[in-house]
Swiss-Prot record:
GO molecular function, one term: potassium ion transmembrane transporter activity
Example of a GO cellular component annotation carried by this entry: plasma membrane
Record protein name field: Probable potassium transport system protein Kup 1
Organism name: Lactococcus lactis subsp. lactis (strain IL1403) (Streptococcus lactis)
Pfam families registered for this protein in UniProt: K_trans, K_trans_C
Cell inner membrane recorded as keyword: no
Keywords annotated in UniProt: Cell membrane, Ion transport, Membrane, Potassium, Potassium transport, Symport, Transmembrane, Transmembrane helix, Transport
Membrane topology qualifier: Multi-pass membrane protein
Main location: membrane
Residues that span the membrane, as ranges: 14-34, 58-78, 101-121, 147-167, 175-195, 196-216, 220-240, 252-272, 294-314, 345-365, 374-394, 403-423, 427-447
Amino acid sequence: MGYESNRSFNKATGAGFIIAMGIVYGDIGTSPLYTMESIVQGQGGLERISETSIIGALSLIIWTLTLITTVKYVWIALKADNNHEGGIFSLFTLVRKYAKWLIIPAMIGGAALLSDGALTPAVTVTSAIEGLRSIPAFHEAFGQQQLPIVIITLAILAVLFLIQRFGTSIVGKVFGPVMFIWFSFLGITGLINLFGDFSVLQAINPYWAIHLLLSPENKAGIFVLGSVFLATTGAEALYSDLGHVGRGNIHVSWPFVKVCIILSYCGQGAWLLQNRGKSLGDINPFFAVLPQNLIIFSVILATLAAIIASQALISGSFTLVSEAIRLKLLPRLRIFYPGETFGQLYIPAVNLGLWLAASFIVVYFQSSAHMEAAYGLAITVTMLMTTTLLTVYLSHYQKVKKVLVGLFFTVFIFIEGLFFAASAVKFMHGGYVVVIIAAMILFVMAIWHKSDQLFYKYLNSSNLNDYKEQMDKLRKDETYDLYHTNVVYLTAKMDKEWIDRSILYSILDKRPKKAKVYWFVKVNVTDEPYTSEYEVDMLGTDFIVCVNLYLGFHMRQEIPRYLRTIVTNLMESGRLPQQNQTYSITPGRKVGDFRFIILEEKLINARQMPGFERFVLQTKEQIKKITASPARWFGLHFSEVTVETVPLVLSDVKNLEIHERISEENQGES
């Protein structure tokens, strides 16, 4: 990255400030909708909550936002960018060269973050819609019935997920202004209610946070941290969205967002101090603090904020999955780019999965209070994994002093470990749903990663130099018809002149393929997100071209587009003869036709393999049946493509023993 690019990344602008509002802070910005409500319920409701519990909980929220969100993520994690990209997989690409085991926290953290993508839309939208109960007309019509809330929430989620296929560039332009209004609303209403009881400002003193955890008045004990953690669940998303808005814009906008959020919590706390001990039923402090004439406006604004938060999380899930695919941690899925920019992704399988999961969660849990019981567990896991990777980044990549690295690891593992322990109790109260989703994603990741290792273990290679003479003779053999001018093989294994033996089997044995030029193309995914480079080795010929493509993990792997440029460059440099065409609608065309060959390896002799390896490879074959075809993944859907099935030659597996049965008559003859 050049100087100007780095300068732009670290620079803050007015437009970037507004854009950050709509992209980065959706999740953490909607937490005031449900965090205090969860804390109040955990303390036995409004009738039983004590002053110590209110001020202590506020103190815990303030210092959680300060230590985890501000210190860990805004001050430290944002510096760990991979060519201006953030998130757990970008962090992993920076440190994976230091230890192989780092793939484990990367996969666990990624799976947990993806599972959270199903719960967050359900919680935020349901919490916002439940505000309708504060409107007298709605309350008179439906009372405390939850069914209308569920139906409205499901309808909003349906619309939200259905519009993903069309892109979000148009509506995305209003996300920033709407969220700026939302945060201003939080800050102003919080400040107004703060005048009701300034004693809540005692919460700035961390003494009250520690005092609450040790106080007998704390009816939830250490598990109050499970509710407090809801205030900072969006911190991981803040890091993941680094590449969309830049470090400078986050550094400038976060203080404004943090102040507005804390004012909202303090306003709710002041109202709770004034009304504790009253019998008001199940209330949400967020809506309870508002005057009646603002309820409808607040519900509409909260719903818009919840939708924007959900949209940001959905888009983040698409990006996370696309990164995992290119890092070979997930199978290839169909990816579309409906927007005007590369960053706008749409993955139908992920969209459908999130929609079904979010809808199931709404129907299963019914209310936001029940959903909150399951919320946060997955994110505590992701944060612990990020802390692990950040520790390696600081010690090995940044060469920070060991004492400081040890201090960082100890402090945040301890804090996040407490949050994890407090959230773990949620497992039996609905947290198991998110854990099951995360476990399923992790299972697929583990299978895909391990199968890739086994593929290279059992794949045979041959030296192209040993077959150059045969290939040259074949392309000049008049007894064979020309198969195609250019035959292109896509290979996962090519090391200089060494290549997958199955490719040579396809050219020479299966049906000799006469061509003028044989191309062997391997795609190498780099740790830098936007790399676009290639290397060519023609092995001293003018008919064999070995191409290594180096593409960043954010780049689309559209082979024909890159190959077109490479062919032109080789012909212009004289390394590749021109392929003048007699018949063409393009006068003077110098490049012939192309045929792409995709080899699909099928497992053979599976019974002779170790049981675990057999299970991994057979499971991968089943998963591949529902994933995107290689032709579509490599942008070949408008090209001529042949898919051939070849056996996966297991070089390390012994042949089955068999003996000839000789009859007595044959013995006599011999």
